[in-house]
Amino acid sequence: MLTARLSRPLSQLPRKTLNFSDRENGTRGSLLLYSAPFVPVGRRTYAASVDPVGSKAVLITGCDSGFGFSLAKHLHSEGFLVFAGCLMKDKGSDGVKELDSMKSDRLRTVQLNVCKSEEVDKAAEVIRSSLEDPEKGLWGLVNNAGISTFGDVEFTSMETYKEVAEVNLWGTVRVTKAFLPLIRRAKGRVVNISSMMGRMANVARSPYCITKFGVEAFSDCLRYEMHPLGVKVSVVEPGNFIAATSLYGGTERIQAIANKMWEELPEVVRQDYGRKYFDEKVARMESYCTSGSTDTSPVIKAVTHALTATTPYTRYHPMDYYWWLRMQIMTHFPGAISDRIYIH
């Protein structure tokens, strides 16, 4: 059931009636929606009760750019000892150079490819030996590293499905398993960056959705197991922040992905769908990538709260009103209704 912060009685609110059909039962009906003012989700005020940061240490994956890069700098400013896991540390990416240029003993970049067990194990040993008291453990782990792609199911190769899963899902599992002994000793926090696409599917995003649904399930299982051990597990589900994170690297990168995808399609798929349909899907993706929020602060605030609050939330939803409402409808309403609104 949707909940709203109402400024006047429900009966006085503007109403919108949406007709829908139930294909299985052959019935027709209507859904009465009330439009009500909500507190913008991206500006949510979190509970103020927090644990003192002190000398607590955290590891963040995927710090070369995007959320991870911004989060590393923010948590450092909050007083944390930050280990910034970077895919391109060995190659000196711009993000690594900027973080290293801060020349702080409390901000250390670490080479970390979440797909390689040897790098994950090496990072765990480096971080353990860098802690003031390894027996007290590591306070926080933020699994942020991730990649994405787009394309209908018939446009997406099995190699692409595996590549996205290796980073987003198995990378999260791999890093978590490597650092859980340290997290358990500290009775600390695990914060997994999922997505609104981990709660609701969308067209042309199946590789990404599959992995983020998996992160959600993994996080729930881990939360149940860690509860009696004093470790708290939270999931952050950002909305559309592609414009802020440059996840696709701009329209040129999208076109490059699209051209490669088209060239590798089986001839029967190209003939059945046609280039016009394919190009329309690419254009929609370009529009989506340039229409999102350019401000990462809602996500940064959510992760910070999950790491510092005495009682962190199970899930955080830093997203604008449109995506928040859509997620509620797609996860709480019968499929016949949500399909009628967003598909038919």
Curated annotation (Swiss-Prot):
SUPFAM superfamilies reported for this sequence: NAD(P)-binding Rossmann-fold domains (SSF51735)
Q: Which family does the entry's similarity section mention?
A: Belongs to the short-chain dehydrogenases/reductases (SDR) family.
Where it mainly occurs, coarsely classed, is: mitochondrion
Biological source species:
Bos taurus (Bovine)
Transit peptide, start-end = 1-46
Catalysed reactions, semicolon-separated: (R)-3-hydroxybutanoate + NAD(+) = acetoacetate + NADH + H(+)
> Which CDD domains does the entry mention?
type2_17beta_HSD-like_SDR_c (cd09805)
UniProt key word Cell membrane: no
According to the UniProt entry, which residues carry Phosphoserine?
A: 246
Oligomeric form and interacting partners: Homotetramer.
Q: Which InterPro entries does the record cross-reference, listed alphabetically?
A: NAD(P)-bd_dom_sf, Sc_DH/Rdtase_CS, SDR_fam
Please, which domain of life does this record's source organism belong to?
Eukaryota
Q: What is this protein called?
A: D-beta-hydroxybutyrate dehydrogenase, mitochondrial
Q: Where is the PTM N6-acetyllysine found along the chain? A: 73, 97, 103, 177, 212, 260, 281
What is known about regulation of its activity?
Answer: Requires phosphatidylcholine as an allosteric activator for enzymatic activity.
Q: Which UniProt keywords apply?
A: Acetylation, Allosteric enzyme, Glycoprotein, Lipid metabolism, Membrane, Mitochondrion, Mitochondrion inner membrane, NAD, Oxidoreductase, Phosphoprotein, Transit peptide
GO CC, one annotated term: matrix side of mitochondrial inner membrane
Q: Name one GO biological process term.
A: steroid metabolic process
